[in-house]
């Protein structure tokens, strides 16, 4: 339990697939309900830099953010086939889609980032590790709503 552990956010690893890209990098993973798990990244001096941290947002909101930045962007991830048409119709800045061979998670990118983050001291123990969920699951939302309704009915009784 005291072994060192390096946490690698999924969208960071996906962005790292486009090592040394000159454009902004926008990984998009389909989160259902017109939302994506995403972030905005760039490479500076061969280093992945987070422009906007990972988040779960409606794809329309992400398009607005990217239009406001006014920079070229490259998209990758399983959200590309889902939201490609929406991007084509609404994005006003130059954009492209990553080639198929780097469009999905790759163990090599996770390992490379693990080495970098480890050298930077971004290490925790297994006991300290807490998964970071960007959105509450549907089951958790429904359970919370049910508990809230039960409390309300108890107050009214």
For the regions a language model picked out, list residue spans one by one.
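Acyltransferase
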Residues: 96-157
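Surface "functional belts" at beta-alpha junctions
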Residues: 3-104
């Amino acid at each position: 339990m005291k072994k060192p552990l390096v946490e690698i956010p999924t969208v960071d690893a996906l962005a790292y697939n486009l090592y040394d890209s000159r454009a902004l990098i926008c990984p998009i993973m389909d989160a259902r309900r017109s939302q994506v798990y995403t972030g905005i990244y760039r490479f500076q001096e061969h280093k992945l830099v987070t422009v906007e941290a990972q988040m779960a947002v409606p794809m329309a909101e992400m398009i607005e953010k990217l239009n406001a930045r006014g920079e070229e962007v490259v998209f990758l991830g399983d959200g590309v086939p889902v939201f490609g048409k929406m991007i084509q119709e609404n994005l006003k800045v130059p954009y492209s889609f990553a080639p198929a061979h780097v469009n999905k998670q790759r163990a090599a990118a996770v390992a490379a980032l693990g080495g970098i983050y480890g050298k930077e001291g971004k290490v925790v123990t297994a006991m300290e590790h807490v998964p970071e969920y960007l959105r509450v699951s549907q089951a958790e939302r429904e359970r919370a709503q049910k508990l809230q309704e039960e409390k309300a009915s108890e107050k009214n009784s």
